[in-house]
Curated annotation (Swiss-Prot):
Key enzyme in purine degradation. Catalyzes the oxidation of hypoxanthine to xanthine. Catalyzes the oxidation of xanthine to uric acid. It comes from Dictyostelium discoideum (Social amoeba). The active site is at residue 1302. CDD domains: fer2. Keywords: 2Fe-2S, FAD, Flavoprotein, Iron, Iron-sulfur, Metal-binding, Molybdenum, NAD, Oxidoreductase, Peroxisome. InterPro entries: 2Fe-2S-bd, 2Fe-2S-bd_dom_sf, 2Fe-2S_ferredoxin-like_sf, 2Fe-2S_ferredoxin-type, 2Fe2S_fd_BS, Ald_Oxase/Xan_DH_a/b, Ald_Oxase/Xan_DH_a/b_sf, Ald_Oxase/xanthine_DH-like. Belongs to the xanthine dehydrogenase family. Binds 1 Mo-molybdopterin (Mo-MPT) cofactor per subunit. Residues 253-447 form the FAD-binding PCMH-type domain. Disulfide bonds: none annotated. PROSITE patterns: 2FE2S_FER_1 (PS00197), 2FE2S_FER_2 (PS51085), FAD_PCMH (PS51387). This is Xanthine dehydrogenase. Its cofactor is FAD; Mo-molybdopterin; [2Fe-2S] cluster.
Length: 1358
């Protein structure tokens, strides 16, 4: 970065064409010869601004969002400033010239004060792990800068380019909506206490909790701490005046591999293109950026056309609108919206806007906001994606494209190409090498012309289409009534049916169109059209994209929707002609999806006499996280080398040879290390030593590390890693759980649990059912990928800074791999950007890689896994297959369960034994079953080793259980809630593993939820809705959970803590747990503050480190507060006991003075606390009758969810979810409610949206947010109510509390079971009353095909 003296002086500044100038957070930046291959994210992080996070590198998570501001000239030659949120990971550094960049650091910080957005997100508990937070704040900030008069609904719909895995989104939305300048069309949602709370102050009716301080007060006023107040724009930083006068000239930047051009005229652009015909045109880099990053494609010449006036204009013409090819999708949408709005009161003009409305309807679901803000219409067309959202719309509309080039004399030559001739084959279009796309002409719609667009994807927001389409028909009155459209019949004069996702390119259906033209618009044409669509849109078995039956049924289902939509309009036009009558039951099929404003409430109980325990105190690091000052591993400012693993590209193969010679010659490369370079033991198995750090002979999964490349930068190491040549001898691979079962590929391990007398159970049963149920995998998708920084010290000392839930295990295995003592390795961290179990063991192998490299290089080495590497190598939640047999009475009482559980462990054990054990323990969920026989087996496959994930096998077993409960309900014709109630454990009843269920809150939770959710009234309303609607169906389900709390391995139920009290009265706490967003540090601070009776501000936690607290258990199993809290309390009590004699002599002195007096008296004010959970531990026996008690106590909860499905597409919406969870006396209701909401949404995603797809070759297809879909802002329940059960103290844990992280996750499956009820209602329309299997997750494909109507049956294999 160069700061030229003229930049800040008064003399004219003359910039060279190889210099890049922009403003960064208000300061001028000038770079000589910038690297054309650098993204904005790469550059900004390289200069030490770490608020932008690298979450995915494909523009789909929003962690790297920043605000880009620039001056735009309008048609009337006026200038306006445009602010937009864009993705730093894709937006090129070289495209910033003349613009202003604002990152999170430019908004506010702790020292100078928080921006109002930062403050409200922080105060409203909108940040847990914090990794996604800066990006979310910048998305909101940019939106409010551009849209200061936004409604709450406008704001709520702005986050489609951002993801959060922790919060469940509700607190973020509440904080964001407080900036609305005006209410939405719907009733304004007032924002109550943070979190939106109904507070029940136990034991003191006169006191309330002040939302500002979290302390008791007596004002008796529940005042919102989050004001409903717009952002004050006049106090925001102004756009740099320097840039208002900045002359945008041509640029040329030359890098080692790529040359970047920014021309200013069309002639200049065409001249470059004529000379360099292979040049790529880049506007937003949203496609080229993916190709260069993930496919290692190098484009030597890049041309950025955003300064060429002809390409950035939009013009109205007599017959339509002409859009310049470089116009962004957001700009186009805004322009078209303006046309529509201006003609709202002009019926004739408004009828011309049909195509514009169709485009806007598709843009709503096109990628995310940040991508639309950068991507251009021309780029979308020229990419020619076969699953494009917009191309079918433009095909149907009859758009015309203009190409332009220079002839040999330098004259411009233009060529018109109708869009139906533009797409030639897969990603090949009719553009000559010297041509560019100049503009797109979009015609107006004509009278009696109807155009409608549709799209179905796995997730509504920011997802690629499974099928997209657009239909246009031009009707004319039949001759005898042509003089008057009233009461007339109509026939089709012209039509286009355009589809994406059904061929290698976007296509039209010529045969169907030909059949339709001349036909009378009536129901009779539907059957013929559907049959012709079948032949027009063939898909062979095994076609790319899969889902053959589903995709084909969408083609006809969408046309049926379109037919109803047009008919409904014709019914009005024709004055009620019965030919066009759409029945009341059918009408909802024509409704476009429109999400109401979300809302809800959070209820909890506090106990003022326990302050600060039970108080809603915000996250300790919230302010740091909202300002971007919270540091994660990759943010540590230390010069280091970078390591990248070299993976096996085969799922099962002997490694015959490895040649790194070419890689070692690449720029910046320092070394290549493999198994022969490991000084200690080549083993990183966390429990059973069956994993190699680097493969010695045989790769056991696709992605297995063969070695690592070390280079000066991550990009250099990544590129060089692809140059390592590996010769394989491929071996047969097992890549699915079904394949493992059929081939008997199991680990030599089984666990059996038996209770009662199975023969007696069967004999007492009036009915016996059996079946099989499959539970899919789930990717953790923590926003911060795995990362480690290893710093060598004196001799063989190493400091390992790792994003891990398991510092002690990391320390131990790194020491073993290096052949040194654990006393020479310190593992430490401040926080993780999410974990969810995925960093309990799988983080360790990347730490070992960095440690090996650092050991040899004698330099700091950093390894940060790219998202695709992380997802494809670190394992998932275990998928399960269950085979069950259940006996029950005619009254619904369950008598016997025979269950076989098969879990896919992957290629190694990892901690799969513990996962399977917990699944076995939770196979009965909340129900007393007197006779059980449960066998668990681990399948061995050539896939990444699966690992811990929130719930640790419990959710898989419980969803299996609830599936057969539904089958019991179906068999008996009883409501499923009655089956559940009838079989609940009663107080002190004993489980199959011989543990008494004491302090049983299940029935109480259930009964309260029945009332709070209005279950019975809503069940009636759902039935009424289903009778009145044919193609939209609703379902409602109420689901319980009983979750055992403890590690099932006895040894892990221990914790340590170190507490220091200083003479100024402040306290430093260190404990063995890791902070990953769950608020553990905040709770530990509360416990220490309570013990010493000091404000929470006097207690501080800096980090977790193995040289402060050694030999710790991983932060997992939802008991970290239980374990570490007791250890902290123990240390505090030791110190207090030592202080007591001094206190007795000085009873009235403040705590600070007491500390000084203790020091004077030589009292030790430091203590090492320890806690071990008593009376826990369980050992399975071959007989099936084990020994011990696996759990310290149980959590109880229940959730009721109501959904609506579209039976023609499989789309679903969660209308309402009510959750009640027993957390004892909550240590911190704000934290705990956040955990409940986040876990619920994660569980909802696991059981509905999130599908891990692995090819038969072992290659994982879902390796990033573009292919793997976690819930987004749009997916959370529209009404979301969460309550913490009151008056339920738990005598088994710290301050009568309970752990909270895992138990709520399974309750998200209430959405899955509500979907099942809705599908059942849909099947009844087709007289299908038999049981049907609905495997988990209930994806849109499974929902649609399970509805089993004629549209599905048309394509079902016989």
């Amino acid at each position: 970065m160069i700061d030229d003296e003229n930049l800040n002086g008064k003399e004219p500044f003359l910039k060279k064409e190889n210099q890049l100038l922009f403003f960064l957070n208000g300061e001028k930046v000038l770079i000589n010869e910038p690297n054309p291959e650098l993204s904005t994210l790469d550059y900004i992080r390289s200069i030490g601004l770490t608020g932008l996070k690298r979450g995915c590198s494909e523009g789909a998570c929003g962690s790297c969002t920043f605000m880009l501001s620039n001056v735009v000239k309008d048609d009337n030659d006026t200038f306006r400033i445009v602010h937009r949120a864009v993705n730093g990971c894709l937006y090129p550094l070289c495209a910033l010239d003349g613009m202003a960049v604002t990152t999170i650091e430019g908004l506010g910080n702790i020292d100078k004060g928080l921006h109002s957005i930062q403050e409200r997100i922080s105060e409203n508990s909108g940040s847990q792990c914090g990794f996604c937070t800066p990006g979310i704040i910048m998305a909101l900030y940019a939106f409010l800068r551009s849209n200061p008069n936004s409604t709450q609904k406008d704001i709520e719909q702005n986050f489609d380019g951002n993801l959060c895995r922790c919060t469940g989104y509700r607190p973020i939305l509440d904080a964001a909506k407080s900036f609305a300048n005006q209410p939405s069309d719907e009733q304004l949602v007032e924002l109550p206490l943070p979190p939106m709370a109904t507070i029940d102050d136990k034991k003191d009716d006169t006191q309330m909790i002040c939302p500002g301080t979290g302390k008791p007060c007596n004002c008796k006023t529940k005042t919102s701490h989050i004001p409903n107040k717009p952002m004050e724009l006049n106090s925001e930083p102004i756009f740099p005046p320097f840039l208002m006068e900045y002359k945008k000239e041509s640029l040329k930047f030359t890098g080692s591999r790529v040359t970047w051009y920014t021309p200013t005229t069309l002639e200049e652009l065409l001249k470059i293109k004529k000379e360099k015909t292979n040049a790529k045109i880049v506007v937003g880099n949203t496609e080229i950026g993916i190709e260069t990053r993930f496919r290692s494609i190098v484009y030597p010449t890049i041309i950025c056309p955003t300064r060429v006036e002809e390409l950035i204009q939009i013009q109205k013409e007599d017959n339509g609108v002409r859009v310049g090819a470089s116009v962004t999708l957001t700009e186009m949408k805004s322009y078209l919206n303006g046309i529509i709005k201006s003609s709202e009161n002009d019926e004739i003009a408004n009828k011309k806007n049909g195509t514009f409305k169709a485009i806007i309807s598709q843009l709503k679901w096109f990628a995310g906001n940040q991508v639309r803000n950068a991507a251009s219409i021309g780029g979308n067309l020229c990419t020619a994606s076969p699953i494009s959202d917009l191309n079918p719309v433009l095909l149907a509309a009859g758009a015309v494209l203009t190409m332009v080039s220079l002839d040999d004399n330098g004259a411009k030559v233009r060529r018109q190409v109708p869009i139906n001739q533009f797409f030639l084959r897969y990603r090949v279009v009719d553009i000559k090498p010297e041509e560019i796309l100049e503009s797109v002409f979009i015609p107006y719609t004509r009278p009696l012309e109807f155009i409608q667009a549709y799209k179905q994807s796995r997730r509504r927001e920011d997802d690629i289409a499974i099928v997209s389409c657009c239909f246009r028909v031009l009707l004319e009155p039949i001759a005898e009534s042509a003089s008057n459209t009233v009461d007339s019949n109509f026939k089709i004069k012209d039509c286009v049916l355009a589809y994406g996702g059904m061929n290698v390119k976007a296509v039209t259906c010529e045969k169907t169109e030909k059949q339709l033209i001349g036909s009378v618009w009536s129901r009779e044409l539907l059957n013929d059209a559907c049959l012709n669509l079948e032949s027009d849109l063939p898909l062979a078995a095994g076609a790319p994209g899969g889902m053959i039956e589903y995709r084909r049924s969408l083609t006809t289902g969408f046309f049926f929707k379109y037919f109803l939509t047009v008919s409904k309009q014709l019914y009005q036009i024709s004055n009620g002609n019965p030919l066009y009558l759409v029945s009341d039951k059918e009408k909802s099929a024509t409704d476009a999806y429109s999400r109401p404003l979300s809302f809800g409430e959070q209820n909890y109980q506090t106990q003022p006499d326990k302050h600060p325990i039970t108080q809603p105190i915000k996250h300790q690091s919230a302010d740091k996280q909202v300002t971007g000052e919270a540091l994660y591993v990759d943010d540590v400012k230390m010069k280091s080398l970078y390591a990248v693993m070299v993976p096996s590209l085969k799922a099962h193969a002997n490694i015959k040879s490895v040649d790194a010679s070419k890689a070692l010659k690449a720029p910046g490369v320092k070394a290549f290390f493999s198994a022969k370079d490991i000084p200690g033991i080549n083993d990183c198995g966390p429990v059973i030593h069956d994993e190699e750090v680097f493969v010695t002979k045989t790769a056991l999964f696709h992605g297995a590390p063969i070695g690592c490349i070390v280079a000066e930068t991550h990009i250099q190491a990544l590129e060089a890693s692809k140059l390592v040549a590996i010769e394989y001898e491929e071996l047969p691979a097992i890549t699915s759980i079904e394949d493992a079962i059929s081939k008997q590929s199991f680990f030599p391990f089984t666990h059996l649990l038996k209770d009662g007398d199975m023969e007696k159970g069967w004999s007492e049963s009036d009915h016996i059912i059996d079946g099989e149920f499959k539970v899919g995998a789930q990717e953790h998708f923590y926003l911060e990928p795995n990362g480690t920084l290893v710093i060598p010290g004196e001799g063989k000392e190493l400091t390992v800074i790792s994003s891990t839930q398991n510092p002690t295990k990391t320390q131990a295995i790194v020491a073993s791999v290096l052949g040194i003592g654990q006393n020479q390795v310190v593992c430490k961290l401040k926080r993780l950007g999410g974990g969810f179990g995925g960093k309990e063991t799988r983080s360790i192998f990347s730490s070992c890689v960095a440690a090996i490299a650092s050991y040899h290089m004698k330099e700091p080495v950093r390894i940060i896994l790219d998202r695709d590497t992380d997802m494809s190598t670190t394992g998932t939640r275990h998928p399960f297959i269950a085979r069950y047999r259940v006996g029950f009475t005619k009254e619904g009482l369950i008598k016997a369960l025979d269950l076989e559980l098969y879990a896919d462990a992957g290629f190694s054990y990892d901690i799969s034994v513990g996962v399977l054990d917990r699944a076995i323990f939770h196979s009965e969920n909340s129900y007393k079953i007197p006779n059980v026989n449960i066998l668990g087996r681990l399948c061995k496959t050539n896939l990444p080793s699966n690992t811990a994930f929130r719930g640790y096998g419990g959710p898989q077993a419980m969803i299996i259980c609830e599936n057969w409960v539904e089958k019991i309900s179906k068999t008996l014709g009883m409501d499923s809630y009655k089956i559940r109630e009838l079989n609940f454990y009663k107080e002190a009843e004993v489980t199959a593993y011989r543990q008494s269920v004491v302090n049983n809150m299940m029935k109480r939770v259930w009964d309260e939820l029945m009332v709070k959710s209005n279950y019975h009234q809503r069940l009636i309303a759902v039935e009424k809705f289903n009778k009145e609607n044919r193609y939209k169906k609703r379902g409602i389900s109420i689901i319980p959970t009983k979750f055992g709390m403890s590690f099932t391995v006895k040894t892990l139920n221990q914790a340590g803590a170190l507490v220091h009290v200083y003479t100024d009265g402040t306290i430093l706490v260190t404990h063995g747990g890791t902070e990953m967003g769950q608020g553990l540090n905040t709770k530990m601070i509360q416990i220490a503050a309570r013990a010493f009776n000091v404000p929470v501000s006097d207690v501080f936690i800096s980090e977790t480190s193995t040289d402060k607290v050694p030999n710790t258990a991983p932060t997992a199993a939802s008991v970290s507060s239980d374990l570490n809290g007791m250890a902290v309390l123990d240390a505090c009590q030791q110190i207090l006991l030592r202080m007591e004699p001094i206190r007795e002599k000085n009873p009235n002195v403040p705590f600070k003075q007491l500390c000084t007096l203790c020091f004077v008296e030589r009292v030790n004010l430091s203590a090492n606390g320890f806690y071990a959970t008593p009376n826990v531990g369980y050992m399975f026996k071959d007989s099936g009758v084990g020994e011990g008690t696996p759990f310290n106590y149980f959590n109880f909860g229940a959730a009721c969810s109501e959904v609506e499905i579209d039976t023609l597409t499989g789309d679903h919406t969660t209308l309402r979810s009510d959750v009640i969870l027993d957390v004892g006396d909550s240590l911190n209701p704000t934290i705990d409610i956040g955990q409940v909401e986040g876990a619920f949404v994660q569980g909802m995603g696991w059981s509905t949206l999130e599908e891990v797809v692995t090819f038969p070759s072992g290659y994982m297809f879902t390796r990033g947010p573009s292919t793997y879909k976690i819930p987004g802002f749009n997916d959370v329940p529209i009404e979301f109510n969460v309550s913490l059960l009151g008056d339920a103290p738990n005598p088994k844990a710290i301050h009568s509390s309970k752990g909270v992280g895992e138990p709520p996750l399974f309750l998200g499956s209430s959405v899955y079971f509500a979907i099942r009820q809705a599908i059942t209602a849909a099947r009844l329309e087709n007289n299908l009353t038999n049981w049907f299997d609905l495997q988990s997750p209930a994806t849109c494909e499974r929902i649609r095909t399970s509805c089993l109507d004629n549209f599905v049956l048309q394509f079902r294999k016989q």
